[in-house]
Amino acid sequence: MSVYSDQTPNPVAAVVILAAGEGKRMKSSRSKLLHEIAGHSMLSYAVTAATAVQPEHIVVVVGHLRDQVEAHLAEIAPHVLIAVQEDQLGTGDAVQAALGQLADLNGDVIVTLGDVPMLSGETLAALLNEHRTQQAAVTVLTAQVPDPTGYGRILRDADGLVSGIVEHRDADDAQRQISEINSGTYVFDATILRAALTEIAPTNDQSELYLTDVLALVRQAGEPVGALLIDDRWQTEGINDRIQLSRMNTEVNRRILQHWMREGVSVVDPSTTWVHASVDLAPDVVLLPGTSLEGATSVAAGAQIGPDTTLIDVEVGENAVVTRTQGSLSVIGAGANVGPFAYLRPGTTLGAGGKIGTFVEAKNARIGAGAKAPHLSYLGDAVIGAGANIGAGVIFANYDGVRKSTTTVGAYDFVGSNSVLVAPVEIADGAYIAAGSTITGNVGPGELAVSRSRQRNVSGWVARKRTGTKTARAAEAALEQKEPS
């Protein structure tokens, strides 16, 4: 959602997102920017924040593992422009690469980082407003943090105005005591930025072109440099290793859960409950310990999820109960009951009031209202009518080694325990399948299908074949009791 209206005067000329770094400390074959926070890539958060201020252009600067990053951008934001930083020569060089995609650009340019996922569009809008209000040439977003290690420090003069930024590795002992840090997010006047970038030089320990040096040049030229100090330090937190990634995930999840609890959702144990940013929950939902809701999962009012349940892209109806279940790309109807230890694979739809019970696996199965499969069954490529009862141990044999076929069970059918339905087969409404049957042909309405060998009892077999065993002795005792006195 945009933080500006379509009538906002002087729109942002461009937002530049720096996403070219190597991310060595992640020790990953994936680009750092593609690692996820609450179900979304770090880079997607940056693009969302940038989009919120309605810029004329969004430019993402790529470099390390650029093919991965470009492919991801093609999925989530095909409208963005791509600039390539061929060599890792610093943030100043990266911005120069971005401006190469924006010839004759005038107006305000926001520069931000791709690995600061909690930075919001509202904060970018506030930074832009501060920049325009102060009529500054450049405005930097800052925060006070308890441990500034690794961050650039904000230098201020005797009047409290920003005089420059020094990177941590280049700071002296006194400067390292400063707790106000550079977030890496700025608003620049495009003309001033373009000119200043031609003047900065690699005079630091890394022999890189620092974008931060632009502030000192602007200040030396007598142009105003502004700053917006924000209270929420998490909006300036970058991610460079797995520890920081874990910490950020925890903080984002904490905020997501707090949001939903304020909206009427009960979370019994927030420390073990994880909810993605894209999940939708209704009032009076209860999340029990060990619950993980991911992707586009939605849970309607009054439903109870957990404990120990993971749902990915699952729609849960009102007052449903889902216990110790793994599910993905499925629909659970209102008042339905699932679990414990159920497995819902993609394409499963359980109707209102239906039941999928203990150790039942369903895949591409449409299960009607009130139908039940209480335990120990496999329902693969199935169409099950309303009110049908699937007994324990029933297998829908859907695969012949070459192709998968569908089994149809009609409304209010009764399928006896330990039966195998060999697809393709259709069982009409109101039919019975005797326990232990292997069904290979269609069954008509009201028919009983029995497909099993006739039982034969062999008298005396245990005494002859298992002589001396406990079983034989038990049989002998039982026979003696049956003999007339």
Task: Give residue ranges: language-model regions.
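Catalytic-core segments of class I nucleotidyltransferases/pyrophosphorylases
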Residues: 163-254, 258
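Glycine-rich N-terminal loop/short-helix segment of MobA-like nucleotidyltransferase
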Residues: 13-37, 53, 76
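Extended, small-residue-rich solenoid/repeat segments and analogous flexible loops
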Residues: 220-324, 332-337
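Glycine/small-residue-rich pyrophosphate-binding loop that anchors the diphosphate of NDP-sugar donors
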Residues: 182-185, 277, 405, 423
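Conserved N-terminal catalytic core of the sugar/cofactor nucleotidyltransferase
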Residues: 2-14, 41-129, 133, 470, ...
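A short, conserved acidic/glycine-rich loop-to-beta-strand motif
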Residues: 134-144
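Rossmann-like NAD(P)H-binding beta-loop-alpha module
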Residues: 143-174
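Glycine-rich hexapeptide-repeat left-handed beta-helix
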Residues: 3, 313-485
